[in-house]
Amino acid sequence: MKLLIQGNNIAVTESIHDYVESKLEKATKHFQTFATKVDVHLSVANNARITDKHKAEVTVYANGTVIRAQEGSENLYASIDLVSDKIARQLRKYKEKNFGKKTHVQEKTSEVLPEDPVPDNLIGDRAPELPSEVVRMKYFAMPPMTIDEALEQLQLVDHDFYMFLNKDTNAINVIYIRNHGGYGVIQPRLGKE
């Protein structure tokens, strides 16, 4: 398994490198068969107003799946401990879900929500403000998947949303975590309405 450690506003010393390597080796030792690459990004915020100055982000690439975790604290070593525990839990969950014994079939349900029109006064007289320029572009592979598979990926990447190619409709969809609990899916609709 390939391990890449990068630092932002911090020099990655040999002791930090060894500590990260030992913690992640311990966290990923049972998952060596499907984890191919691990990226670690350590950063220190030089801002007095930020309480959790030391942040550790770990991204594990496993069988075409991205599993990501990030933690921050006042101590770099504590952040590394927290993120390694979190990534170990996520890897265990991924392994149990995809490689565990399936003894029973769980019935999957879904609910179709009514399509209510958006009120005209939602934005008011404000004009939406967009950034003046694109500062970063990302490209990634987008294999077709079901909404349930996209939900699983959303939970693994530790983000608020996940964009995917819907296997059923062959359209790009976004699944997101709702503020009031649960998940939502944004699907494109052709036409003006």
Curated annotation (Swiss-Prot):
Keyword entries, A-Z: Cytoplasm, Translation regulation
Gene3D superfamilies: Ribosome hibernation promotion factor-like, Sigma 54 modulation/S30EA ribosomal protein, C-terminal domain
A GO cellular component entry from the record: cytosolic small ribosomal subunit
One Pfam family it belongs to: Ribosom_S30AE_C
Compartments, as annotated in UniProt: Cytoplasm
Induction: Is repressed by light, since the transcript is synthesized in the dark, but upon 20 minutes of illumination, transcript levels fall below detectable limits. This light-repressed transcript is present only in dark-adapted cells. Is rapidly translated at the onset of illumination; in fact, is one of the first proteins to be synthesized upon illumination of dark-adapted cells. Repression of the transcript in the light requires protein synthesis, which suggests that a specific protein is directly involved in lrtA light repression.
Protein name (record): Ribosome hibernation promotion factor
Species name: Picosynechococcus sp. (strain ATCC 27264 / PCC 7002 / PR-6) (Agmenellum quadruplicatum)
Gene name for this UniProt entry: hpf
